[in-house]
Amino acid sequence: MADPQLITTAFDLPGYRIERSLGVARGIVVRSRSIVGTFGASIQTLFGGNISLYTSLCERARQDAYERMIEEARQMGGNAIVGMRYDATEIASGVTEVLCYGTAVQAVRAG
């Protein structure tokens, strides 16, 4: 499995040498809002500020997508991920796809 310290949005790993690029690893999660959550969030919008119900939903979706990406990188034989990114798309009303992706690599300590 990729070491959490060896996952970066950069395209290099200071102190490591990338020996092999294994391709794109990705984790995809599709989430929908519940009726109760949508109602609660609607109430929060009346008062302004952070809509904590949606923030929590987004954080869970991103974490799940991140963990799925790590698992795919591990299955590909990678121990690190470079160029990691998130993307989110509303694919239907109230249904959002969260994608976490990066390049799975085999990295070794330099030096």
Curated annotation (Swiss-Prot):
InterPro entries: UPF0145_dom_sf, UPF0145_YbjQ-like
UniProt organism field: Burkholderia thailandensis (strain ATCC 700388 / DSM 13276 / CCUG 48851 / CIP 106301 / E264)
Record protein name field: UPF0145 protein BTH_I2656
Recorded family membership: Belongs to the UPF0145 family.
